[in-house]
C-alpha cells in the first residue's frame, strides 16, 4: 500500500487538500494517509499528528512571539514524516511552513517525492474606457 503524508499549514490549505484527497480516495482506495491537517481532512478519516490550530498564527507579532513553538512543530513534523516514510509528501499552500518542512525532509531523505499544491489565483483587470 502506498503512503501519502499531507502537509498543510492553515485552514485554507486543509480545505484545498481535502478536495484533492476526496477525489483521490474515489480513484484509489489502496492509499494510506497521515497529515498535519484540520477538520476537512479529519472528515475524510485522515489522522493528523497534531491539531492544525497549534501552528496557525496570524500576524507578524504572533509569529515572532511563538517562534520557538513553531520551530518545535517544524522539527516534530519532520521527524513524523521521516518515521512514516511516505511514498509522497503532498504539501499544500503555506509555503513558509510546508516548504521549510519539505526542505528538511529532503535533506534527510533525498529520494522522497514531493508535490506542492496551491490554489490558483485570479487576477482581475478592470479596463476603464473614456466615453
What are these regions (language model features)?
Residues 3-129:
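Active-site and donor-binding regions of nucleotide-sugar-utilizing enzymes
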Amino acid at each position: 500500500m502506498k503512503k501519502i503524508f499531507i502537509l498543510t499549514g492553515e485552514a485554507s490549505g486543509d480545505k484545498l487538500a481535502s478536495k484533492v484527497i476526496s477525489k483521490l480516495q474515489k480513484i484509489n482506495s489502496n492509499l494510506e494517509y497521515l497529515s498535519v491537517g484540520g477538520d476537512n481532512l479529519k472528515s475524510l478519516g485522515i489522522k493528523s499528528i497534531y491539531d492544525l490550530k497549534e501552528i496557525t498564527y496570524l500576524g507578524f507579532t504572533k509569529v515572532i512571539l511563538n517562534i520557538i513553538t513553531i520551530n518545535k512543530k517544524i522539527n516534530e513534523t519532520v521527524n513524523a514524516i521521516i518515521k512514516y516514510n511516505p511514498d509522497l509528501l503532498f504539501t499544500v499552500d503555506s509555503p513558509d511552513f510546508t516548504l521549510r518542512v519539505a526542505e528538511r525532509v529532503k535533506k534527510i531523505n533525498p529520494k522522497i517525492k514531493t508535490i506542492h499544491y496551491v490554489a490558483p489565483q485570479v487576477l482581475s483587470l478592470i479596463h476603464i474606457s473614456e466615453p
